[in-house]
Amino acid sequence: MIRIDAVTKRYPDGTVAVDRLSLEIPDRAITVLVGPSGCGKTTTLRMINRMVEPTEGSILLDGQDIRQQPVNTLRRSMGYVIQNAGLFPHRTILDNIATVPRLLGRSRRQARERAAELMERVGLDTALAKRYPYQLSGGQQQRVGVARALAADPPVLLMDEPFSAVDPVVRKQLQDELLRIQEELGKTIVFVTHDIDEAIKLGTRVAVLRTGGRLAQYAPPAELLSAPADAFVEDFLGADRGIRRLSFFPSAGLELQTAPLVPADADAGTLAARATAAPYLLVTDPDGRPLGWSEPGRLTAGAVDRERLLDYGRPFVPGTDSLRAALDGAVLSPTGWAVAVDGEGRAVGVVSQQVIGEAIRAAHGRVAERAGEAAGR
């Protein structure tokens, strides 16, 4: 556990970057520091590995004050990932990742074997091993940065806005990859971001900081969304925090209806049989994966003009995705139906906005009931 105890960072000109901050950061979890510019997020992160020394207070790692350890020893127990990867431009990808193992005395062969293993773990093709950083995309460079930070198998990983410089699609991929890696490795991660959606998605606990480095609230994401501590936190979370909260309600209980499916290569008899089943038919490929919605009369036997199909929105996986994902799929679909798929992307049913709304009301009711029981104890 990392314990930050009444830590203040005051610079010689009188600027206070962090003001009496106290946090307990649990082991094997992702703790996110989030807040507006100037709230001391990065300063706090840098104090954990002594890139910046606190003016007052103390930081303990597993019960020991970090100032009692040599700086180099402390930093070798912590991986560090920054916004723009910070790769060595003159080294290959493999040797960038192998840097820390080599510094720790491993042979060149051992370090490179470890680097190759980590390339696979972070989703990088080992065919990229001999390339240089400038030959990689921004997302690939960030994966290299994560791999390098993990190379010495540190128990602690510090991440300073690592995904903010990439586009939204790549950012989501990197976030998902981090969650997968964390599930496998169980590191103690301190993650800095200014993006509240990223904080809610990744964080086991989220610390919201005010300008001037003061703690506004420290709580699990679901609690943060349901009970913001004050007007500042509520405003920072944004007007759509109710929608975000749906991310913590499972979709497993949704009652699916049989999807009115028709294969893209259906013959005239099949089309005729399905034509009266529903006002819209969900056209699928030969493997049962959805392609789009169509009115029955617009389909021609033996062939489907895919450009004329209506978008089916974003599918969701029951039991894996949340009610937010299901609602998103229904809202995006012109039919008002969300398409449910299995793990292979095959359509397994549909659910209406009305049914999703009923599930949301039931979920809120259960939360309120549990809150009432807790208050009565």
Where are these regions (language model features)?
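Hydrophobic anchor residue at the start of the ABC signature
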Residues: V146
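Conserved ABC ATPase "signature" region
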Residues: R109-A127
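ABC ATPase NBD coupling module
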Residues: D65-G79, L103, R109
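Short helical segment in ABC ATPase nucleotide-binding domains corresponding to the A-loop/adjacent helical element
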Residues: L94-R102, R112, A116
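The feature captures the beta-strand-to-loop junction immediately N-terminal to the Walker
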Residues: V34-P36
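Helix-to-loop junction immediately C-terminal to a conserved catalytic motif
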Residues: N49
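The conserved cystathionine-beta-synthase
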Residues: A259-P279, V283-D287, A303, P315-E344, ...
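Conserved signature/switch motifs of ABC ATPase nucleotide-binding domains
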Residues: Y134, A152
